[in-house]
Amino acid sequence: MVNTRRDCYDLFRRMPEGTLHLSALMCGEHRSRVIARIKEHLAAKEPLRVVSTQVVEAGVDIDFPVVFRALAGLDSIVQAAGRCNREGRLNAAGRLGDVQVFVPPKPAPRGMLLKAKDTTRALMATGDLDPEDPQKLRRYFKHFYSRLNDTGRTFMEML
């Protein structure tokens, strides 16, 4: 999962044949067909590669054994992790799902995406970031919302 539709499309074009593309740029009917194909592959336990935007983070019932997620806000990373071993099928084999967070080659666009990513990165630097701990999630949101109105300039510089 990547942060922007452009990144999704660019990455998809670099992937091997057979990779599926899923983003909000697609019309609803096309997205539904791709989601159906994904579910067919997963049900048949066939290898599958999907390049997606956050469109699958919420409201899409898909269960992947492995998820790669571009660095983003902690809330987005947690949502992406919710697509991994969602149904607990790997538990019978004594395995958990595998969620890998990577730093994309292009920076996040300015605005909320960048502030969310920067907040996650700042908390990661403290070594005190646990997405399963509700206290840590509260800490993330406190830091994130405190950054929303921060323009990076002082009041005197804006005069």
Model-found features: residue ranges?
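C-terminal helicase lobe and adjacent C-terminal extensions/tails of nucleic-acid helicase motors
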Residues: R6, D10-I35, K39-E40, F68, ...
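Alpha-helix/helix-capping structural signal
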Residues: N3-R6, Q54
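Conserved two-lobed SF2 helicase motor
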Residues: L42-E57, R69
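Conserved ATPase-coupling elements of RecA-like P-loop NTPase cores
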Residues: V60-F64
